[in-house]
Amino acid sequence: TGSTRVGKLILKQAAEKVQRVTMELSGHSPFIVFDDVDINKVTDMAIAAKFRNNGQVCISPNRFYIHENKKDEFTKQIVEKTKKLKIGNGLNNDTHLGPLTTKKRLNELELLVDKTKKEGATVLCGGQRPPTFNKGYFYEPTVFDNVKDNFTIMKEEPFGPLIPLLTFK
């Protein structure tokens, strides 16, 4: 649904017609990487899970917790693989990321990226509109480091191509 407000609107509309409704209201899904994984496989899985439909999927992972023993290796590979993703027309077979759905979504994503940087995160890749796209709602897939649990990005669903990295012991 994208938000509790939209979920309530959908429920009201369904109630008027006495329709059954099932919703997932902003689960803010975690992606957890323990120290016993194959980093090559898990980074491929992270890319597929996060960037499907440019991160605009309710079940897209939004919080990436990486075991401290695997952080450097995971970070290196996720950044390298993210930089190789092609942005473009979603109907082209060689495109990995199409546009965001609306100008409003793009503006909200830019505000969240700015806020995340101001809160102390470091942008490892992405973090802006692609310079070669003059039209459309395109945004580069972005990986953040030095994110803390109290940052806004950890509480608000980004609904876009953002990966915040945190570590655990």
Walk through the language-model features, giving the residues of each.
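Short, solvent-exposed loop/beta-turn-alpha elements that line the ligand-binding surface or hinge
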Residues: 154
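Short, surface-exposed loop/turn microsegments at beta-strand edges and helix-strand junctions
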Residues: 157-158
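ALDH superfamily catalytic-core signature
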Residues: 2-148
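Short acidic-hydrophobic, aromatic-tinged amphipathic segments that line or gate anion-handling sites
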Residues: 33, 165-169
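Glycine-rich nucleotide-phosphate-binding loops and adjacent flexible coil segments
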Residues: 161
